[in-house]
From Swiss-Prot:
UniProt-recorded name of the protein: Guanylate kinase
Binding site for ATP: 15-22
Family annotation (CDD domains): GMPK (cd00071)
Organism: Nocardia farcinica (strain IFM 10152)
Gene Ontology cellular component terms for the protein in this record: cytosol
Amino acid sequence: MVEHTRKGRLVVLVGPSAVGKSTVVRCVRERLPELVFSVSATTRAPRPGEVDGRDYRFVTRAEFDAMIEAGELLEWAEIHGGLQRSGTPAAPVREALAAGKNVLLEVDLEGARSVRKVMPEARLVFLAPPSWDELVARLTARGTETPEVIARRLETARIELAACDEFDNVIVNDEVTSACEQLVSLFVSTNSR
């Protein structure tokens, strides 16, 4: 008898700064403990409570450049006008998918576009704020960015929101539990396809 291994499914989550991606992802990971969450490499500094290797792989610009040069990233991008870089190490994603595991990537708009080019089977999901005013309030309430950084992040958010028709699904994060359940249901329905 020949045993067929099911290839895992890749879901790519995108949303503007302060839309609540990390909170929703945390909820999804609690609901789907078998889900593989790709840890992005980033040149930005850790926020309070973030752990290197769990939330992100925090690297210097020189280390990030070396990863690009070695072809180790599935996607990468300059974010917020070059303020930082972020990317997805390719090997862990490809290995998990080949082993039949479902993978969740949390990336920016350009990252999602890059993943779609190299992995067209990926399901792209956009996490949207309930309103522009709510997004602005969430971003300023974090208290972790300067006014200049907030302005750059809001400009990036306008571009991201304008591109939401490029996504397979749009989930409005007006309430974390509801957004989490919608994302979980996409994984469950993706599994049955």
